[in-house]
C-alpha cells in the first residue's frame, strides 16, 4: 500500500535520493521547496517518476505557506531536509537561524496541526563539535558544537523533543556526517564528491580538509531517512548515522586509482566534527540498514557521473566556478 510523503528540501542532495527511492516503490510524493530547479532530480530519476511528483513552491520560513501545503497534501509522514549548510550559517548566523531553527519550528508546528504520524528531520554530527580522540561517539556524548550550524541542529533536536512531550508529535532526528554521491555539490564536505566529478572530467581538484571523517554513501543515507519515516516507534528520537570512518588520504587514493591519474590532492585542517560516530542505536531499533563499502560507493558515483556526461546531462557548474576562482583546484 502506497503512502503520501511531504518532503522539504527534496531538491537537495539527500532529498533527491529520498524522492528517487520513494518514487521507485510507487509512493505519492509532495515536494515543498523554494526553487523549481529540478536538475538534481533529473540527474538520478526516470522522467516518468518525475512526472508523478507534486511540487509546491514555498519557503519553510513562511509558516502559513507550509501549514497550508502540508494540510492540503494529506501526508501522514514528513521528511524535513531543507536548510542552510555550515558556510552560510557561519557567514550570516541570523539568516542561518531563520532558516534552520525558525524554519524547522514552522515544520514542526505544521506537522502538529496536520496530525501527521511521524516527522523525520536532518540533524547533524556537527552537534558534537570536535572529538577529543578517535572513540566513536554515541548519541549521549557531550554536545559542544563548534559552529552555528551545529548549535542550530542541536536546538532543533530539543524543540522536536518538546513537541513530543507537549503535543505527542513523534519525530526522528538523524545525524549524518560526510555524505557523498551524485548531487552532493554544496558545503565543505562536498569536496570529495566534487573531486570524483573532476576526476572523470580529467580536471585536477584539491580537497580543502584532511584527517579522518565518517563517510556515508547518499543512497544509504536516504534509505535510513525512509526507514525511520516508515517504522520508527512513538517518541522523539535522535540517532547517529555511520558509514565508514576513513582518512581523506584513503578517499583520495581510491578516486585517483579509479581515474587512472593522480588528479586529486588534499590539505587543510580536519573538519570540526568528530571523525567517528556510533550507529548501534538505530540498528537496534530498525535492524540492518544498507551500508555500501567505500570503494563500491565511489565507483558507483564515478560511473554515474560518466553516464551523465555521455548523455550530455552532467552539471559541471560548480567545477567550472572553482576553475575560474581557483578555489578548490589542485595547487
Task: Write out the residue ranges for each language-model feature.
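C-terminal substrate-binding subdomain of Rossmann-fold SDR/epimerase-dehydratase oxidoreductases
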Residues: 208-211, 215-331
Amino acid at each position: 500500500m502506497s503512502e503520501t510523503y511531504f518532503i522539504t528540501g527534496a531538491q537537495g542532495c539527500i532529498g533527491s535520493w529520498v524522492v528517487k527511492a520513494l518514487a521507485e516503490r510507487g509512493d505519492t510524493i509532495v515536494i515543498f521547496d523554494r526553487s523549481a530547479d529540478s536538475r538534481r532530480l533529473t540527474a538520478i530519476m526516470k522522467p516518468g517518476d518525475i512526472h508523478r511528483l507534486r511540487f509546491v513552491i514555498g519557503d519553510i520560513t513562511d509558516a502559513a505557506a507550509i501549514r497550508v501545503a502540508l494540510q492540503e497534501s494529506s501526508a501522514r509522514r514528513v521528511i524535513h531536509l531543507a536548510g542552510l549548510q555550515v558556510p552560510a550559517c557561519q557567514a550570516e548566523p541570523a539568516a542561518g537561524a531563520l532558516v534552520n531553527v525558525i524554519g524547522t519550528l514552522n515544520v514542526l508546528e505544521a506537522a502538529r496541526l496536520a496530525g501527521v504520524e511521524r516527522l523525520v528531520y536532518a540533524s547533524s554530527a556537527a552537534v558534537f563539535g570536535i572529538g577529543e580522540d578517535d572513540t566513536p561517539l554515541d548519541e549521549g556524548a557531550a554536545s559542544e558544537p563548534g559552529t552555528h550550524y551545529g548549535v542550530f541542529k542541536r536546538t532543533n533536536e530539543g524543540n522536536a523533543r518538546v513537541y513530543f512531550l507537549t503535543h505527542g508529535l513523534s519525530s526522528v532526528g538523524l545525524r549524518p556526517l560526510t555524505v557523498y554521491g551524485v548531487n552532493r555539490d554544496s558545503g565543505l564536505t562536498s569536496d570529495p564528491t566534487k573531486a570524483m566529478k573532476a576526476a572523470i572530467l580529467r580536471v585536477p581538484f584539491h580537497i580543502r580538509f584532511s584527517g579522518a571523517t565518517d563517510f556515508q554513501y547518499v543512497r544509504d543515507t536516504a534509505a535510513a531517512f525512509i526507514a525511520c519515516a516508515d517504522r520508527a516507534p512513538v517518541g522523539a528520537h535522535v540517532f547517529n548515522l555511520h558509514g565508514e570512518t576513513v582518512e581523506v588520504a584513503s578517499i583520495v587514493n581510491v578516486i585517483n586509482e579509479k581515474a587512472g591519474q593522480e588528479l586529486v590532492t588534499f590539505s587543510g585542517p580536519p573538519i570540526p566534527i568528530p571523525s567517528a560516530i556510533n550507529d548501534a542505536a538505530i540498528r537496534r531499533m530498525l535492524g540492518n540498514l544498507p551500508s555500501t563499502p567505500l570503494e563500491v560507493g565511489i565507483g558507483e558515483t564515478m560511473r554515474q557521473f560518466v553516464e551523465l556526461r555521455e548523455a550530455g546531462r552532467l552539471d559541471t557548474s560548480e567545477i567550472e566556478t572553482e576553475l575560474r576562482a581557483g578555489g578548490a583546484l589542485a595547487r
